[in-house]
């Protein structure tokens, strides 16, 4: 019985440890945002569209493929992720959303929201989770573990995939 309890506790702790970090408090973002997200892994490339908008006390994140078919929808309310709609859970999208929240946090609010964050010129990181290399404040590459990169740019009519 005790062995079963220990296994359950270990599973619970590992589930908590796998959650991507969130800011101490919600940063001030210029919402709504429409972004083109290019997912890159080894020699695979995939385009997504992301809409981030304020909804009440929370922030809604809607990820779609280029045809507008939903890939993932989440709401961040009171520093907790909540499913939005009937889509199944998508851990990769939740990790992406948390990384984007880190990348989009204004410089003046970064260390208050992410005390372990490091900055150097056009590079921002939160080891071991994410690294962000900025070309401009709205054009950047997110590097996540397992050789996964996301090139993020504002969505414009000219830049639509």
Can you annotate each of these PLM segments?
Residues 12-15:
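C-terminal motif of bacterial Sec signal peptides marking the signal peptidase cleavage site
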Residues 21-78:
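N-terminal secretory signal peptides
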């Amino acid at each position: 019985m005790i062995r079963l309890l220990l296994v359950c506790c270990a599973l619970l702790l590992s589930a908590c440890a796998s959650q991507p970090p969130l800011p101490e408090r919600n940063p001030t973002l210029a919402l709504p945002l429409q972004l083109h997200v290019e997912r890159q892994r080894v020699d695979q490339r995939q385009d997504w569209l992301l809409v981030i908008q304020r909804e009440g006390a929370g922030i809604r994140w809607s990820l779609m493929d280029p045809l507008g078919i939903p890939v993932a929808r989440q709401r961040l309310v009171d520093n907790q992720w909540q499913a939005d709609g009937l889509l199944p859970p998508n851990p990769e999208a939740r990790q992406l959303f948390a990384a984007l929240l880190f990348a989009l946090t204004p410089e003046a609010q970064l260390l208050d929201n992410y005390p372990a964050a490091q900055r150097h010129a056009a590079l921002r990181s939160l080891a071991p989770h994410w690294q962000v290399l900025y070309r401009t404040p709205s054009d950047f590459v997110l590097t996540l573990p397992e050789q996964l990169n996301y090139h993020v740019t504002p969505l414009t009519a000219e830049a639509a995939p």
